[in-house]
Regions:
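N-terminal carbohydrate-binding accessory modules
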Residues: 1-37
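Structured loop/turn residues at beta-strand edges in well-structured enzyme cores
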Residues: 6, 40, 103
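Small-side-chain structural scaffolding
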Residues: 10, 23, 29, 39, ...
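Substrate-binding/catalytic cleft of secreted carbohydrate-active enzymes
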Residues: 44-241
């Protein structure tokens, strides 16, 4: 970024705001969110299948957070689905027009874990670049569940693996569901060590790689959080367990 190699330590943001049920609409609230994130070393937010309100970008400009927005899709892209395609393209161009001047708005993806017509995805990204070439564009986050590897036409690759390969040689995160990788991946099937890294996997991509949803593993709940649920979301699951 601006000539400097930049390491992203990211936050998966799925628009989860338990007290209100919607994202904050003011800069002050978002600054507090980002300041908390920064205290954990986070400098990048990936918005899962949504674009946050303008206040979020304004706050990110101040706090130095890089934003990846996404179109609201978790599914498949097909040239035959005209209504969906028209909706998504309208959303994309409005996002670029209304949010594009914010320096924190660095990346835009087509959605989450998409499948479908890559040529159509590539055509859309070409249109976005022609409309506004200030941003980086991707086909989506973890498209084809990583099995497709690096595909020409996108500026960066967000994925859990860089294509298929023997063992865990293409993995760029440690934890997998047992249906997605042998015995649940590196975290679940190897001994703790300080020698494993993702150098070989990253080398298989000709463009920058962002590891997709790295924190997918079980944790024991903190029952002290029960008292914090004073808004629209009720923690029935925590009460049961």
């Amino acid at each position: 970024i601006n000539g400097f190699k930049t390491f992203l330590r990211g936050k998966h943001d799925a628009c989860v705001f338990p007290l209100t049920g919607y994202a904050p609409m003011d800069v002050k609230s978002w600054r507090k969110v980002f300041q908390t994130a920064k205290s954990y070393g986070i400098n990048y937010y990936r918005c899962h299948s949504y674009t946050p309100p303008r206040a979020a970008f304004a706050a990110a400009d101040i706090e130095g957070i890089y934003f990846q927005a996404e179109l609201p899709l978790w599914g498949s892209i097909s040239p035959d689905n005209h209504r969906l395609n028209d909706f998504l393209l309208n959303e994309a161009y409005m996002t670029l027009d209304y949010m594009g001047n914010h320096p924190s708005f660095t990346m835009l993806g087509l959605g989450n874990q998409l499948g479908g017509d890559v040529d159509l995805m590539r055509n859309w990204l070409d249109g976005f670049r022609k409309h506004d070439n200030r941003h980086l564009y991707s086909f989506g986050s973890n498209n084809f569940l990583g099995w497709g590897g690096a595909i020409d036409g996108e500026d960066y690759l967000t994925t859990c693996r860089v294509g298929g390969g023997e063992g865990y040689t293409t993995h760029v995160r440690s934890s997998f569901a047992f249906v997605d990788a042998e015995k649940g991946g590196i975290l679940n099937n190897t001994r703790p060590n300080t020698r494993a890294d993702y150098t070989a996997a990253i080398a298989k991509s000709p463009r920058p790689v962002i590891s997709h949803e790295t924190g997918q593993f079980q944790i024991y709940p903190d029952y002290k959080e029960l008292e914090k649920y004073t808004g629209v979301l009720h923690p029935y699951n925590l009460e049961i367990f």
